[in-house]
Amino acid sequence: MQINILSGALGAEILNFKLNAITQNNFEELNSLLLEHKVIFFRDQNISSEELMSLGSLFGPVEEHAYVKGLNDFPQITRIVKAANEKNQWGEGWHSDVSYDVKPCKTIILRSIKIPPVGGDTVFSNMELAWETLDKDIKSIIENKNALHTSNGSKFFVEDFSEMESNGNIGEKYSNEHPIVRTHPETGNKILYVNPTYTKKIIGLPNKESDELLERIFRHQEKLDLSCRFKWTENAVAILDNRCTQHYAIADFYPGRGLGHERIMDRIAIVGDQPF
């Protein structure tokens, strides 16, 4: 096994490591890599859907997506498809997956199936480092406060992604409050747990003050020195700790630049704990 660090903030590409050979007996090595690097990448993984599910189940129960219908044989696997003529990219914009849930998923596994020849990278950001480097005046205000996280409903993907199908929860929206500074249940590290896609308000502050403070926090979270960037190739797998990272799928292969290509990914998510 060889470990190539991708940036000083987070991320590592793991070479000479076959994910379909992972069992409960050697899982701890994989989990230790994830806790250390927060997002880990593996190329040239000939891993089937059944093996992907087995891999995910080592981290915990695999959940179905709130809005998207999964594969017929594996409903917990969400197939993310951007057709060649579509502009939007699923996962565009900084976010932590399903932070609006009572128990947001703890781990996400992504598998690339079809990748555009140019563009389509994903950027990941370290929210433990974001907390460590946040201005002290902001820390003093938010350290013991909660924030409201609200989903956007399913309408956006029903309209924008023709190749993806709703599971029937068209009008459903979910809202939950979580600590702005959560604690990682495995490491004890502090995490800045808000994101511009789903976090709507700081509880206990007037709307104007909440909006202004969240905007300052979001600008801090977007700093490139908190991030790493991964260029996908087909049959690559990313495993990310959704508790302490955010990610952004870049939509830079739209036909307007002559780069209209299909992009297909599979996603599974592992049930998490209620943030504390």
What is each of the regions a protein language model found here?
Residues 1-237, 242-276:
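Non-heme Fe(II) oxygenase catalytic core, chiefly the N-lobe of the double-stranded beta-helix
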